[in-house]
Amino acid sequence: MGQLIDGVWHDTWYDTKSTGGRFKRTEAVWRNWVTADGSAGPTGNAGFAAERDRYHLYVSLACPWAHRTLLMRQLKGLEEMISVSVVHPLMLENGWTFDDDFPDATGDSLYQNEFLYQLYLHADPQYTGRVTVPVLWDKTQHTIVSNESADIIRMLNTAFDAQGARAGDYYPPELRDKIDELNGWIYDTVNNGVYKSGFATSQAAYDESVTALFHSLARLEQILGQHRYLTGDHLTEADLRLWTTLVRFDPVYVTHFKCDRHRISDYRNLSGFLRDIYQMPGIADTVNLPHIRHHYYCSHKTINPSGVISLGPAFDWDEPHGRG
């Protein structure tokens, strides 16, 4: 869990001393966009046109942020257009690595790097910042397009439609205001909320984050009691963004991040929602619980020094979801 400073790798944990024990996530640095015609997107530079086999995703199967991009890639049928490399789930003094001695870890098929930070240095030899996944890489310009998952899923949603992507709009114009509103508080209190709880180094910071987290889960349980998905009957990116956190909640966050007021399995609607999306064609293939559990329990030595992996609660993913 380190970072690059002026192109040099430093093995450093998050600094919470200056924030009252509160975890503060840094913003993504690369914010370019792939667009249908290569014109500039909402942020960043132009020049990234949607083309078959031009782009490559670097992901961790453990990471909820990277998982979003794999979901959208699958839903839009982009598996043959956008290739993927999967890092090793264990992240220690060198950050994410391309070791391939764990099932489904692929190594770096493009450059045969040992570490993900080397890819960042390929894009910017003087880069300063965290080295995170996902990374959307341009194989033509040999650079990072984006390392912001929220942006990448919107690119995959529409940019490749003219290239033969599967039909489906997960950010439709008529729902965008509602989706943006949901994304805002779900990100702050749930997606990032589990990390703010788990990485807190003061009681006050933990209490604040975990209280907000379970308040939001109760709110989501109520919303999902009214309709199948967060905005109604249409699956949107808001559902996908929430879902990747819910996948990891009972197996990891309850124990490892001390988010233990309730389990997702204790919520009728949230657990049904979790199963509903999991049982959609191809979605189960994006879920890798061995990577998830190994990453969290074995990588975060400040939280779990022994590296012992919790057994975790049982959950039947294939039980009828009772929704729709």
Label the predicted regions:
Residues 1-324:
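C-terminal alpha-helical interaction module
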